Amino acid sequence: LTCVTSKSIFGITTEDCPDGQNLCFKRRHYVVPKIYDITRGCVATCPIPENYDSIHCCKTDKCNE
């Protein structure tokens, strides 16, 4: 599985997930109105959203773009 780890105006950076980590995730952490801190990567289980987080998990290559 290949997941996106970062995305910018220059393109995307990806990583091949290690054995046991079969999900890609994207976490949007609310900072201030219209501003989010976005984290992406591989996980074994989908994280539970905390505070003002929004989490998307998926199982296909680069699905967390």
Curated annotation (Swiss-Prot):
The keyword Disulfide bond applies. Its main location: secreted. Keywords: Disulfide bond, G-protein coupled receptor impairing toxin, Neurotoxin, Postsynaptic neurotoxin, Secreted, Toxin. InterPro entries: Cytotoxin_Cobra, Snake_3FTx, Snake_toxin-like_sf, Snake_toxin_con_site, Toxin_cobra-type. Pfam families: Toxin_cobra-type. It is found in: Secreted. Expressed by the venom gland. This toxin shows activities on different G-protein coupled receptors. It is highly potent on various alpha-adrenoceptors (ADRA) (subnanomolar affinity for ADRA1A). Order of potency is the following: ADRA1A > ADRA1B > ADRA1D > ADRA2C. It is also found to reversibly bind to muscarinic acetylcholine receptors (CHRM), but the affinity is much weaker (CHRM1 and CHRM2, Ki>1 uM; CHRM3, Ki=140 nM; CHRM4, Ki=120 nM; CHRM5, Ki=350 nM). This is Adrenergic toxin rho-elapitoxin-Dp1a.
